[in-house]
Design a protein with these regions (language model features):
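Non-catalytic ligand/cofactor/substrate-binding and regulatory segments of enzyme domains
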Residues: 1-14, 18, 24-27, 32-98, ...
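Juxtamembrane amphipathic/hinge helix adjacent to a transmembrane helix
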Residues: 100-132
């Protein structure tokens, strides 16, 4: 983990969305980090950010539960993220049914994006680079 460079290997990261998060604090933008800590997030049709979240630096992160990781660990984990990236590059973004949370859920083979959201909030920690 390298908080200064926003690197959180095998973790889900979250950042607030200006105005929206101020009104509803549990709503924000989510991404997933590969085995090297680079973040991947779905922003819209044809747009997958790598190593940069759409709304700024991660405020919270949650390590991915090792019980849901794959046997081949890093290689398979990274392949699943890239597969989800390729799938979502052709998808339209929809605030309720096809968004950054669904991208993370697909990376983890979790059919229910809400389950990923719950897992994140149960395990979220303040990113060390934000504690000052």
């Amino acid at each position: 983990m390298d908080p200064e460079k926003d690197r959180f290997p095998r973790a889900i990261v979250w950042t607030p969305i200006p105005v929206l998060t101020w009104l509803i604090p549990c709503i924000g933008h989510m991404g997933i980090c590969d085995s090297t800590g680079r973040s991947h997030d779905f922003v819209g049709r044809g747009v997958i950010n790598i190593d940069r979240l759409a709304f700024g630096r991660p405020l919270l992160y949650a390590p991915v539960d090792s019980s849901i990781l794959f046997e081949c660990y890093d290689l398979k984990y990274d392949e699943e993220i890239h597969a989800a990236d390729n799938h979502f590059k052709s998808q339209m973004h929809n605030l309720l049914t096809n968004n950054c949370h669904h991208h993370v859920a697909m990376c983890l083979h979790e059919p229910n994006a809400f389950a990923v959201w719950i897992m994140f909030w149960r395990n979220a920690r303040l990113a060390p680079n934000r504690v000052r």
